[in-house]
Amino acid sequence: MSLGLLCCVAFSLLWAGPMNAGVTQTPKFHVLKTGQSMTLLCAQDMNHEYMYRYRQDPGKGLRLIYYSVAAALTDKGEVPNGYNVSRSNTEDFPLKLESAAPSQTSVYFCASSY
């Protein structure tokens, strides 16, 4: 299998707040073949209303994919193409990669705030 057929997607955990905040993202690392789909789970236990999904490409700053201002209320950020989100409760904000592409090789972040 050639390297051109693989899409390496790196995941990271973003700690928000002054202490160890309760935001977790899983899996931390994953490699996908081009065309595969997967869901990045994000959970927070601080009862925050606002949640955000970002990506950071090599040598670039953070770019907002999607955000949510409350359960069941989501909106697109600057780079939503190829992704879907849902937020059925306050705690969870999963991000689904519909069909992995090499252009989605990135570090992904999840954050929450009041």
Swiss-Prot record:
It holds the Pfam family V-set. GO terms for biological process: adaptive immune response; cell surface receptor signaling pathway. Keywords: Adaptive immunity, Cell membrane, Disulfide bond, Glycoprotein, Immunity, Immunoglobulin domain, Membrane, Receptor, Signal, T cell receptor. It comes from the Eukaryota. Glycans are attached at residue 84. GO terms for cellular component: plasma membrane; T cell receptor complex. InterPro entries: Ig-like_dom_sf, Ig-like_fold, Ig_V-set, TCR_beta_variable. Gene3D superfamilies: Immunoglobulins. Disulfide bonds join 42-110. The keyword Glycoprotein applies. It is found in: Cell membrane. Residues 1-21 form the signal peptide. Residues 22-114 form the Ig-like domain. Alpha-beta TR is a heterodimer composed of an alpha and beta chain; disulfide-linked. The alpha-beta TR is associated with the transmembrane signaling CD3 coreceptor proteins to form the TR-CD3 (TcR or TCR). The assembly of alpha-beta TR heterodimers with CD3 occurs in the endoplasmic reticulum where a single alpha-beta TR heterodimer associates with one CD3D-CD3E heterodimer, one CD3G-CD3E heterodimer and one CD247 homodimer forming a stable octameric structure. CD3D-CD3E and CD3G-CD3E heterodimers preferentially associate with TR alpha and TR beta chains, respectively. Probable non-functional open reading frame (ORF) of V region of the variable domain of T cell receptor (TR) beta chain. Non-functional ORF generally cannot participate in the synthesis of a productive T cell receptor (TR) chain due to altered V-(D)-J or switch recombination and/or splicing site (at mRNA level) and/or conserved amino acid change (protein level). Alpha-beta T cell receptors are antigen specific receptors which are essential to the immune response and are present on the cell surface of T lymphocytes. This is Probable non-functional T cell receptor beta variable 6-7. The gene is TRBV6-7.
